[in-house]
Amino acid sequence: EDGSIKFNGSGIGEAQNSDGGDLIFAHKFKNFELELEWKISKGGNSGIFYLGQEVTSKDKDGNDRLEMLFMSAPEYQILDNAVHPDAQLGKSNNRQSASLYDLIPAIPQNAKPAGEWNKAKIMVYKGTVAHGQNDENVLEYHLWTREWTDLLQSSKFSEQERPLAFQLLNNCGGDNREGFIGFQDHGDDVWYRNIRIKILD
């Protein structure tokens, strides 16, 4: 729509529309810098996943099923902070826009209101990850460290609450330390444009 990728909201939750679902890049990325612009509808929720894996598990009937990308991928949160209830959940605003979802809050929180374009930046380099929002760095963290494991254990991705997600995220990117980038279909209207990826050697 007008040069952007638009997710048409189903209004019934995450990836529930018959023609919906997360949009995932065709190949994996290791060390990279991703920049784009996004805007969200009023009360909307989405996210940008990175270092995600294709993981299959068994359902209750013993059939193979593909796990949702959030089980294996850190998430740069996309949210209408003013209206969506998730903005007040979690800890210390760690579910607001540009936060590492449910793990680290974006500081400063400088998102523009629903319906306005925001700039997002994600840098991944040899285990160091940084999020930027509207030309400001808002958080940095380090994968595959004791601190990373402790963060997971104090979140909704803890070993007790979601053992598979904990295992996958604790070894984020798998053995090759690389994974898929994806845009989340959370059932709300969201737009992405000017998507650029720079490979970092």
Regions found by a protein language model. Give the residues of each.
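Carbohydrate-interacting regions of secretory-pathway proteins
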Residues: 1-201
